[in-house]
Amino acid sequence: MTSRDVARAAGVSQATVSLVLGDKWRGRVSERTAGAVREAAADLGYRPNLAARDLRLGRTRTALLVVPALTNEFFARVHTGAARVAAEHGFGVVIYPSPEGVGRARDPFDSSRTALDGVIASSMAADALVAMRAGGLPLVMLDSDPAGPEAAATVNIDVADGMRQVTEHLLAQGHRRFLHLAPAVDSWTFHVRADALAGALRAVPDAAVRTETSALTVDAARQAAERALTGPGPRPTALVCDDDILAAGACKAVRRLGLRVPEDVSVSGFDDLSLATAVEPELTTVRLPAEEVGARGMAALLAVLENRPPESVALPVELIVRGSTARAAD
């Protein structure tokens, strides 16, 4: 069975069959014709020899997904979304960890610069992009500066809106003394969150915020929150955390100091990981569409590889109000 048989059954040319089965028909072939080709191929039991075609085109049908940590649930969800879309198009996804997401990444192309078709990089610090660009492959950035020159496409989450939603929720609860617990990571996404928090509080004359940074671990966050809560000046009544892991550490700090969440101190997170409902009280947090981020990232890479304009998106987020926030005590 060959593509010629499919073309004859569908009443089209072999070139049209190649376009449709190679998923390059959009803008060249009508949906009706594409459907007829797929139906004819299915009826005849025809499957194109992708390996031969890819060898001819110099393709490996493999994408590299760069994430800061393999153990982080958010990035596991990103991979799930990317792998699902990749599988639908006959691609595979290889995961490459860039530990902590900071500093210069080890060059992933050292072993073979021809074993990949493109790179999707998630929430990377700026310095870690050097090796990615050195590979000379199409790069799609996730949750990164859309104005940056490094990427062929970007897929973003509206983290600024998420931070504004959290801040407005806490302001409505009467909070005016804020602590921002931020990761010690030089990343665009965290700068955007900090700017959004500061901007939302700037319009409230009696509101104040100070920032404490921490490594992205529960214990480091606990120590940072303890320092902030026992430091000089009035104690913050609201701890705004850039990640649910940081928020879990902040909750531990509050309890160790003999205080209560949320009666004495409200705590909010970001991501809506499984951890958010595993702690007590459950975390008020911002739900990020991690799986959709991965799916859109893979779709954008496929568009770049097929010389189609990738879709620029800023995916919406949702504030999830749970038990860790309440009205300010004073």
Descriptions of predicted regions:
Residues 230-330:
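Flexible loop/turn connectors
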Residues 14-19, 55-69, 169, 177-184:
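Short beta-strand segments enriched in small/hydrophobic residues
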Residues 50, 67-77, 95-104, 154-165, ...:
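Hinge/beta->alpha junction and helix N-cap segments in small-molecule ligand-binding domains
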Residues 115-123, 177-182, 211-212, 232-243, ...:
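Periplasmic-binding protein-like
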Residues 1-58, 329:
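N-terminal helix-turn-helix DNA-binding module of bacterial transcription factors
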Residues 122, 142-143, 157, 181, ...:
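Generic beta-sheet signal
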Residues 57, 62-168, 172, 234:
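Alpha-helical recognition/docking segments in bacterial nutrient-uptake
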